Amino acid sequence: MADSHPAAYDAVADAYSHALDPDGVGLVDPVLTELVGDVTGRDMLSLACGQGQDARLLASLGATVTGVDVSTQMLRFAGRHEAANPRGITYVQDDAQDLAAFAEQSFDGVVCHMALMDIPELASTLGSVARVLRDGGWFVFSIVHPCYRGHVDVVTDYLLDHRYRKRLATEWLPAHAYHRPLGTYVEQLTQAGFRIERVVEVHHQAADAGGVPGLLYARAVQA
């Protein structure tokens, strides 16, 4: 992982925690909930969990949840929410690109919500996810849609894998992310031993977005 990556999230942890789920009640995301399905009694990993909003969602659905993140400060906020309202969530600091803290076949499912595009090495991350999943396990993730940014878009370097600096009006997101063509995600999921089961494109809510999908969700199962 790039040296600046943990520091980038540590730097925005306070603003991030106050902007997203400040009361610690858990994420509300119908698409994610549908793709996850019934997780009652299942062992779940919330990958790149940040301050724990996705972990709290999974716990509210009846799962036994472990949250993992590279950022010390993000996990500090996650721990505060857990202490204030215990849900039985365990938080671990580790790198999503190797998940060295976890043994093989530790989890029934892995969820990575709006973070996969911020992790430098996709192939090693997907390989780590596959390693910690049990037979028949699944991986649900969401990303900023790699194809569209607005209802009118000039495509210049879509086919290139590259790091880019976001221009954001908010102070609670790191400035850097990694653009990858949709085909890269498909190819590397396949190489990691996954079969894509569902893809859901969610359009922008802004009135001027013209219904263009801004987010992409997917569920992949071990082939």
Regions found by a protein language model. Give the residues of each.
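Short alpha-helix
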Residues: 176-199
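Class I SAM-dependent methyltransferase SAM/SAH-binding core
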Residues: 43-98
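A short acidic, Gly/Pro-enriched loop at the edge of an enzyme's catalytic core
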Residues: 97, 101-110
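Core SAM-dependent methyltransferase catalytic element
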Residues: 192-194, 207-223
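A short SAM/SAH-binding and catalytic strip from SAM-dependent methyltransferases
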Residues: 109-122
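A short glycine-rich, Lys/Arg-flanked "PGG" loop and its adjoining helix->strand segment in the class I
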Residues: 123-138
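Conserved class I S-adenosyl-L-methionine
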Residues: 1-40, 53, 57, 74-77, 138-167, ...
